[in-house]
């Protein structure tokens, strides 16, 4: 919303009032005031004010959300409309107060490790560079085993499997059955198309994601193990709770959550 600040000088020109196409600005107690019921947020008043006394105020989370899923309840608090949300996590990283969080599964992972279950971490290739310059692939694997993981598998192997199958799918269907094919790897993108562009949903490849390919490969080798996906994106948590995926990926951790586990355990990559 646009708001008139205390810097309003009650100038004789009243430029803000003159340029407003809806007559939403009036003089109240020696200062211009915007009627929110009339304001259309065109911004003309802010541009016309010679004192820069009118500012645009927007919630960082709402500004970051490309789905317009951030709304306000009756008390003015921000709420997430789950019918619009695609779990992309942009609101989460944009909130300067840390007021938005994704559902964590650190407790469940630690409990599985403490109960001596075989826990396998499948890690997105983006782990390189996430934990400082001392974090080489070899040191990262050692650090994961220090946390109690039995094995570490790179999801790059699943990405290769995904690429091969998706390429075969593309050659078979485009352009014989459809004009184009969109990738299937990102669950947030998948959900966005389903909600905003349902007519194009059938053009998304039905190939499994690298995470699922890797998880199923691990489960095939050891059906009783617990698979933990570790990556940069919170949207993977949405993917992992899907009915057809739930048995493949037991838990999901973000790199941020994994960093918290490293710190709690006292893991120092420089000392490994």
Say what each PLM segment does.
Residues 7, 37, 124-126:
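Short strand-loop junctions, especially beta-strand C-caps/beta-turns
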Residues 4, 21-24, 137:
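Generic N-terminal leader segments that precede the first folded domain
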Residues 13-36, 44-81, 86, 90-106:
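Iron-sulfur cluster-binding cysteine motifs and their immediate structural context
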Residues 10, 14-19, 48, 94, ...:
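Transmembrane alpha-helical segments of multi-pass membrane transport proteins and ion-pumping complexes
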Residues 1, 102-272:
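Iron-sulfur-associated redox domains of electron-transfer enzymes in respiratory
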